């Protein structure tokens, strides 16, 4: 087998690459995917989002090493093992990122990736339903919508934010990227609108695009150039030849793993694994970043939450309604209200994110209390803690070693304590008076710094937004893995394009910027002139210097 471009991974970025690289019909594209089909309601029905993440069929099922600052717990670290990658098992929340996120990328050496540069790519990829005119794309492959917003708890959350003195925003992906508002979803016509549905499946209808299901074992490098990919499928090993380039889009865990298996990475570590060093790049696997969050849960005194739908019978009713009409509760991820807030005066951008959910529940679908309730997923999203991805062994089937070093920076503790106290302030507003019952979690007895820290050590979890392990930067940056054209430094014919190249984590969910990365990388690969820079300036809170709201 051979193709002009061989893409490893059909996730958020890989699917976008397959679509754009094959668009003019001049180049052949072959996608290598270790997973399989996304057929069936577990992935396609939005309300079933807890299911695919818990199924080994769709999830690599990684765990971190014991985290010393979190009571040595091993933290769940899912990644999609299916067409569409993690966009097929995620929560379907769509966040571009704040303008300051991308300006920071450029400051860190990713020239040409400032907000003015990436905004046109976000517009190109979007088909926005209800977004801010002039700021959003309307004819791209990726459908983005808002939910039905019928539950009164959603309205109470946004009203409580206003009562607490915070801003509201009509579109946090538009000009005003701060405040309380409606959450956007990658859902269309009642179905999860994954990168597979938006990009990969349309691309596979073209004669010049193919897909092979198998495990990428290593990149073949000859005389300093990537010439193909060794894959395993059906118990046999074979090489897929790349006539032009190999593009790695295998996730922030598996992209650095594959580079290291191929001899690209920290020379000392590769030698310890018995792997021949092809390019000594110490940044491969370094700079691992993520978002953490906890659930703040409250009893609802009125029976308006989704608790009534949790029994198996009623879940079956919702599922049947969705199967028949693609409507009803099954057609939403139920994340329909949110907030992006600044933790302190002097910050240009929000650093706290809220997802509001009108039920008190864990991510695996188990009820947190035998009553109606509501919750927020809340986290400090600009942590300075950094971790790493390394090899466990030279066996391509071995899981990578994930050391996040969560909560290793003192500021993280300060910010998460603030999250607990700020959430109590928001839930204590008049808008929640009609619904507010006892606090389920953390619990009203958790008040002091020491009590909050103890709660956090036991209850903080990943928000599943890993990035940064093949950092993009200037060629003279010894820790950069790819240059701003996404080319691997030191190896010809090889690129990386996915969330692993982010120099710094963005302030929200990563599916949107990952797809944007695939879109922009495709233009670099094809040698196209980048889309014209935008001159639009986003809103900055005029009180930012003196107030957190």
UniProtKB/Swiss-Prot annotation:
Transmembrane stretches, start-end: none
Active-site residue list: 465 (proton acceptor)
First-tier enzyme category under EC: oxidoreductase
Region (Disordered): 530-549
Pathway field: Amine and polyamine biosynthesis; betaine biosynthesis via choline pathway; betaine aldehyde from choline (cytochrome c reductase route): step 1/1
Binding site for FAD: 4-33
One Gene Ontology term from the biological process aspect of the record: glycine betaine biosynthetic process from choline
EC number: 1.1.99.1, 1.2.1.8
Catalytic reaction(s) noted: choline + A = betaine aldehyde + AH2; betaine aldehyde + NAD(+) + H2O = glycine betaine + NADH + 2 H(+)
Coiled coil regions in record: none
Superkingdom of source: Bacteria
InterPro entries: BetA, FAD/NAD-bd_sf, GMC_OxRdtase, GMC_OxRdtase_N, GMC_OxRtase_C
GO MF term list: betaine-aldehyde dehydrogenase (NAD+) activity; choline dehydrogenase activity; flavin adenine dinucleotide binding
Required cofactor(s): FAD
Entry keywords, A to Z: FAD, Flavoprotein, NAD, Oxidoreductase
One GO term describing the cellular component: membrane
Function: Involved in the biosynthesis of the osmoprotectant glycine betaine. Catalyzes the oxidation of choline to betaine aldehyde and betaine aldehyde to glycine betaine at the same rate.
Family membership: Belongs to the GMC oxidoreductase family.
Entries under PANTHER family matching the protein: CHOLINE DEHYDROGENASE, MITOCHONDRIAL, GLUCOSE-METHANOL-CHOLINE GMC OXIDOREDUCTASE
HAMAP family assigned to the protein according to its UniProt record, in alphabetical order: Choline_dehydrogen
Name of the protein in its database record: Oxygen-dependent choline dehydrogenase
């Amino acid at each position: 087998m051979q193709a002009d471009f061989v893409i490893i991974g059909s996730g958020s970025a890989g699917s976008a690459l397959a679509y754009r690289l094959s668009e003019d019909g001049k180049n052949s594209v072959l996608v290598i995917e270790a997973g399989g089909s996304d057929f069936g309601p577990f992935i396609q029905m939005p309300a079933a989002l807890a299911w695919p993440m818990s199924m080994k069929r769709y999830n690599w099922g990684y765990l971190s090493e014991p985290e010393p600052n979190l009571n040595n717990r091993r933290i769940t670290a899912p990644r999609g093992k299916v067409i569409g990658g993690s966009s097929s098992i995620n929560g379907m929340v769509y966040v571009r990122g704040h303008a300051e996120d991308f300006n920071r990328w450029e400051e860190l050496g990713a020239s040409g990736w400032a907000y003015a540069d990436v905004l046109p790519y976000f517009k190109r990829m979007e088909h926005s339903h209800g977004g801010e005119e002039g700021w959003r794309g309307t004819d791209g492959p990726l459908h983005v919508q808002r939910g039905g917003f019928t539950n009164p708890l959603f309205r109470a959350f946004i009203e409580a934010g206003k009562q607490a003195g915070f801003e509201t925003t009509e579109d946090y992906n538009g000009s005003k990227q701060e405040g309380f508002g409606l959450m956007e979803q990658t859902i269309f016509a009642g179905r999860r609108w994954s990168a597979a549905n938006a990009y990969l499946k349309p691309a596979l209808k073209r004669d010049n695009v193919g897909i092979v299901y198998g495990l990428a074992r290593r990149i073949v490098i000859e005389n300093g150039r990537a010439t193909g990919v060794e894959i395993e499928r059906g118990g046999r090993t074979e090489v897929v030849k790349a006539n032009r380039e190999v593009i790695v889009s295998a996730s922030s865990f598996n992209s650095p793993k594959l580079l290291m298996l191929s001899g690209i990475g920290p020379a000392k570590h590769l030698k310890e694994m018995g792997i021949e060093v092809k390019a000594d790049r110490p940044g491969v696997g370094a700079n691992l970043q993520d978002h953490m969050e906890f659930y703040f849960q409250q009893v609802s005194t009125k029976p308006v939450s989704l608790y009534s739908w949790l029994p198996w019978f009623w879940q079956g009713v919702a599922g049947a309604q969705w199967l028949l009409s693609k409507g009803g509760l099954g057609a939403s991820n139920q994340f329909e209200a949110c907030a992006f807030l600044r933790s302190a005066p002097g910050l240009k951008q929000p650093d706290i994110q809220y997802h509001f959910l009108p039920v008190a529940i864990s991510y695996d679908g188990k009820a947190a209390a035998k009553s109606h309730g509501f919750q927020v997923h809340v986290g400090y999203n600009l942590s300075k803690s950094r971790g790493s991805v390394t090899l466990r062994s030279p066996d391509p089937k071995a899981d990578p070693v994930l050391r996040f070093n969560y909560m290793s920076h003192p500021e993280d503790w300060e910010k998460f304590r603030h999250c607990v106290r700020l959430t109590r302030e928001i839930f204590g507003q008049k808008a929640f008076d009609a619904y507010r019952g006892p606090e389920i979690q953390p619990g009203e007895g958790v008040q002091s710094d020491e009590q909050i820290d103890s709660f956090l050590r036991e209850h903080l979890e990943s928000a599943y937004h890993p990035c940064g392990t093949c950092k993009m930067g200037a060629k003279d940056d010894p820790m950069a893995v790819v240059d701003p054209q996404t080319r691997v430094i030191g190896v010809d014919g090889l690129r990386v394009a996915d969330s692993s190249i982010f120099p710094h984590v963005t302030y929200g969910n990563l599916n949107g910027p990952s797809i944007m990365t695939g879109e922009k990388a495709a233009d670099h690969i094809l040698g196209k002139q980048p889309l014209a820079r935008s001159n639009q300036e986003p809103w900055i809170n005029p009180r930012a210097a003196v107030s957190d709201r």
